[in-house]
Amino acid sequence: GDGTVTINEVLSNDLAYDHPTAYALNNIYPNPFNQITTIEFSVPDNNNEKVRLRVFDIAGRMVRDLTNRPYTSGIYKIEWDASHLSSGIYFLEFRVGSLRDIRKINLLK
């Protein structure tokens, strides 16, 4: 299969943290990871742009399209199960409109 993707909204008592002011790829943990990693990102108020998260292998082939939809304001976590993939270096692309952030992730089995 394609693995599992779980999307959760993170809640916090810190008001500034609950209401981000910009789109951002915050954290990927653990990294390196053995099967499951968590990707955290922020979505600001008054948005209607789609958040797209994709994973590419070292050769530039897309191996997973994690999400491609608008989100309401908040901090989100996506858990990605990569157990069906081989060990190696992968690249996570976070894209919203003209914003593009790429991070290297390392799958160790």
Regions found by a protein language model. Give the residues of each.
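Glycine-centered coil/turn sites that cap beta-strands in beta-rich domains
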Residues: 12-29, 33-55, 72, 77-80, ...
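A detector of low-complexity, intrinsically disordered, Ser/Thr/Gly/Pro/Ala-rich segments
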Residues: 2-4, 19, 35-36, 103
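Short, compositionally biased serine/threonine- and acidic-rich segments at solvent-exposed termini, linkers
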Residues: 1-17
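A structural detector for beta-sheet-dominated domains
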Residues: 1, 8, 26, 42-44, ...
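C-terminal tail/sorting-segment detector
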Residues: 65, 69, 73, 79, ...
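Short, glycine-anchored, charge-dense loop/turn motifs used at functional sites
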Residues: 56-63, 90
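A generic structural motif
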Residues: 34, 46-48, 61, 87, ...
